[in-house]
Amino acid sequence: TTGLDPPAGAEVLDRVRAMGMEDRMAVVRAYVGERSNRRHKPGRALERTDYRFDVISDYGAFRDLQRHRLMTIEWQELTPRHGYTRPLAIDESGLAERFDDAMATSADLWSDLSERFPERAAYAVSLAYRIRYVMQFNAREAMHLIELRTSVQGHPSYRSVGQEMHRLIAEQAGHRAIAEMMTFVDHSGEPELERLQAERTAEARRATAG
């Protein structure tokens, strides 16, 4: 047999239900142990808890998140209908009008193609346009994905998705113990500047190594 037999499993559940929050948190913290970096993962017990997220993000962020394999992901057809994301850096550089014109050109081309070539029209849609998709994965994969994708080296688009996932696990799902395990989630608020600094640090290391 595998796992706990029914009486033992029921006994464990009864004991957990009788525990206070602090006692439960103590058990969780003991299970996680000390993590010196995000590659130190807790065991497979986290695979018993699943999360499902309904996400709208720009297509560029979707493509990066789609690369994670230990999950189920389903997406709608890529179109311009959900609008697009214009980075703050575009506004600050005074290029907002040119950016919007480029997005309009992309949408017009999609419209022209969609009637005759509906399956190919998506290739005309800029990566800045939003797409809606559903991601489902267990808590162990959540820790890997969220800690990786919120790091300062990440792109702001998928960083914000990961940060919101972490918040929802803690607040909406009420799984604060699991959210607390994710000690390497970065919620800092200036991702562009931090990403630039991280790139400079990496470049300096490469130069030193070379």
Task: Identify the residue ranges that each predicted region occupies.
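A conserved ligand/cofactor-binding region detector
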Residues: T1-G210
